[in-house]
């Protein structure tokens, strides 16, 4: 059984990044067990390896951190559950297939949202998890950005629970102009983070056996 570790309070992004990187090295060199960090960050914009500087619009006093994960700009902050799985895809019960791993992440989050009555989708050529908010119009509810070192995964998924969505106006989220963002709260689903975490853990064990 993989251990989920909940980081208390609002965590500094750079502190968690170092925590992840250190643990990835331990998995690679010392064969430490797989774990998953559950984090709620203090406000920060992060840029993935495919970012364009013009996609950073007006960040004000929110720090901007350039990371090694895939993807472009996104926002992390209170009310958002960020999930960092550190999994060894080279272990006997896994597959050395990054596309399959991302597909499994998507299925995991979609199933978790479905528990709360939210029908979520993946959209061709658009990274992340989406929900229909109006006819033929979708909003992103979860962002995905991962990295792999010697087949050990890190970075992960950010799901908007009760996030202040106005903060996304400081960037072009994931490089998608005119794309909408949403949250469970905005969809009328009010859930405590601890309750959401229980479902995340249950659904994880169904997908990542």
UniProtKB/Swiss-Prot annotation:
Keywords assigned by UniProt, alphabetized: Acyltransferase, Cytoplasm, Transferase
Residues at the catalytic site: 174 (acyl-thioester intermediate)
PROSITE patterns referenced in this protein's UniProt entry, alphabetically: BPL_LPL_CATALYTIC, LIPB
Enzyme Commission identifier(s): 2.3.1.181
Pathway membership, UniProt: Protein modification; protein lipoylation via endogenous pathway; protein N(6)-(lipoyl)lysine from octanoyl-[acyl-carrier-protein]: step 1/2
Subcellular location: Cytoplasm
Binding site residues for substrate: 69-76, 143-145, 156-158
GO biological process: protein modification process
Site residues, Lowers pKa of active site Cys: 140
GO terms, molecular function: lipoyl(octanoyl) transferase activity
Residue ranges of domain BPL/LPL catalytic in the record: 30-209
Enzyme class, broadest EC rank: transferase
Note: In the reaction, the free carboxyl group of octanoic acid is attached via an amide linkage to the epsilon-amino group of a specific lysine residue of lipoyl domains of lipoate-dependent enzymes.
Family that this chain belongs to: Belongs to the LipB family.
PANTHER family documented for this protein: LIPOYLTRANSFERASE 2, MITOCHONDRIAL-RELATED (PTHR10993:SF7), OCTANOYLTRANSFERASE (PTHR10993)
Function summary: Catalyzes the transfer of endogenously produced octanoic acid from octanoyl-acyl-carrier-protein onto the lipoyl domains of lipoate-dependent enzymes. Lipoyl-ACP can also act as a substrate although octanoyl-ACP is likely to be the physiological substrate.
Protein name: Octanoyltransferase
């Amino acid at each position: 059984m993989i251990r989920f570790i909940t980081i208390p309070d609002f965590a500094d992004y750079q502190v968690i990044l170092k925590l992840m990187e250190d643990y990835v090295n331990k998995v690679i060199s010392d064969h430490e067990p797989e774990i998953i960090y559950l984090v709620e960050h203090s406000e920060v914009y992060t840029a993935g390896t495919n970012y364009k500087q013009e996609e950073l619009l007006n960040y004000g006093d929110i720090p901007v951190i350039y990371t090694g994960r895939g993807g472009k700009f996104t926002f992390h902050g209170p009310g958002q559950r960020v999930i960092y799985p550190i999994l060894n895809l080279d272990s006997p019960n896994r597959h050395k297939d990054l596309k399959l791993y991302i597909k499994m992440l998507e299925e995991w989050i979609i199933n978790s949202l479905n528990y709360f009555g939210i029908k979520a989708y993946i959209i061709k050529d658009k990274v992340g998890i989406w929900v229909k908010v109006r006819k033929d119009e979708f909003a992103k509810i979860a962002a995905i950005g991962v990295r792999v070192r010697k087949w050990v995964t890190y970075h992960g998924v950010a799901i908007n629970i009760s996030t202040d969505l106005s903060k996304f106006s400081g960037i072009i989220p994931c490089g998608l102009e005119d794309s909408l963002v949403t949250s469970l709260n905005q969809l009328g689903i009010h859930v405590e983070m601890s309750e959401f975490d229980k479902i995340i853990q249950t659904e994880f064990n169904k997908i990542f056996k």
